[in-house]
Amino acid sequence: MLKQRTIKSIVKTVGIGVHSGRKIELTLRPAAPGTGIVFSRVDLPTPVDIPASAMSIGDTRLASVLQKDGVRVSTVEHLMSACAGLGIDNLYVDVTAEEIPIMDGSAATFVFLIQSAGIEEQNAPKRFIKVKKPVEIRDGDKFARLDPYFGFKLKFSIDFRHPAVDKTGQELEVDFATTSYVREIARARTFGFAHEAEMLREIGLARGGSMDNAIVLDEYRILNNDGLRYDDEFVKHKMLDAIGDLYVIGHPLLASYTAYKSGHGLNNALLRELLAHEDAYEIVTFDDPQAAPKGFAFDAQTAFA
């Protein structure tokens, strides 16, 4: 059967919170089959566990924020994206603040951490959410949509009307049957505009944001001396975010995702719309790994890496 996966050993790192500017400790621990991805606020007098789920996402203005009984863990999408890309089903994520450290602004550090810990198959079938009917959410000219598809592919289009962004690829389509997440998506960094960063700092946010963990743009150009990691890094990062946003549903999707100018809020609304229609999806497993979509087999310790 196609099996669930966790990590082999505990692994730790320290990074900066993009909003608080504080030093944050992050520990990844193996978890039993059926656990899912569980975030734990170990800095609190009594640690609080928050399982990743579509219904636990609260605030989506600047990141995907998991919430439970007034306790928050923010900026989970890059780590969730790495877990999706590497096929991690079960994991405990201990964090000493209300946000996951930003690291370099991409998913690459989290991929490295997980690969350093090692990936282990577990004796339980991997559960997929198979989309059976189209589901779509719109907000003005923005939209996000899921269609039935035997595999996992995404098509994302952006439109920032900024000279430096417009010079790069605005549209990207990726099918993970033939594309490496680690090589083609994981290193794409978050990006922001210098004038917005100043406004955010004035209200106590983005205190840890810098060119070490983001692509920063002024009105005309990219300010980072080293430029871009990919020619189409902007749209690739939006896709990286979408992969993480979608993975909070708790299982890998068998679906085709299409989006135009979507963000964390629209992605979460799409998951909620899917879950609201029980006839639009089903949970499936694969007794024969060869019968699963290409890209999900336990190959080179990755999912579609």
Curated annotation (Swiss-Prot):
Residues given in the record as Zn(2+) binding sites: H78, H237, D241
A GO CC annotation given for this chain: membrane
Physiological role: Catalyzes the hydrolysis of UDP-3-O-myristoyl-N-acetylglucosamine to form UDP-3-O-myristoylglucosamine and acetate, the committed step in lipid A biosynthesis.
Pfam entry (one): LpxC
Keyword Lipid metabolism: yes
Co-factor(s): Zn(2+)
Keywords: Hydrolase, Lipid A biosynthesis, Lipid biosynthesis, Lipid metabolism, Metal-binding, Zinc
Record-annotated active site: H264
Similarity comment: Belongs to the LpxC family.
Reactions catalysed according to its record: a UDP-3-O-[(3R)-3-hydroxyacyl]-N-acetyl-alpha-D-glucosamine + H2O = a UDP-3-O-[(3R)-3-hydroxyacyl]-alpha-D-glucosamine + acetate
SUPFAM superfamilies tied to this protein: Ribosomal protein S5 domain 2-like
Enzyme class: hydrolase
Name the record gives this protein: UDP-3-O-acyl-N-acetylglucosamine deacetylase
Family annotation (PANTHER family): UDP-3-O-ACYL-N-ACETYLGLUCOSAMINE DEACETYLASE 1, MITOCHONDRIAL-RELATED (PTHR33694:SF1)
Gene name tied to this protein: lpxC
Molecular function via GO: metal ion binding; UDP-3-O-acyl-N-acetylglucosamine deacetylase activity
NCBIfam families reported in the protein's UniProt record: lpxC (TIGR00325)
Upper taxonomic lineage: Bacteria, Pseudomonadati, Pseudomonadota, Betaproteobacteria, Burkholderiales
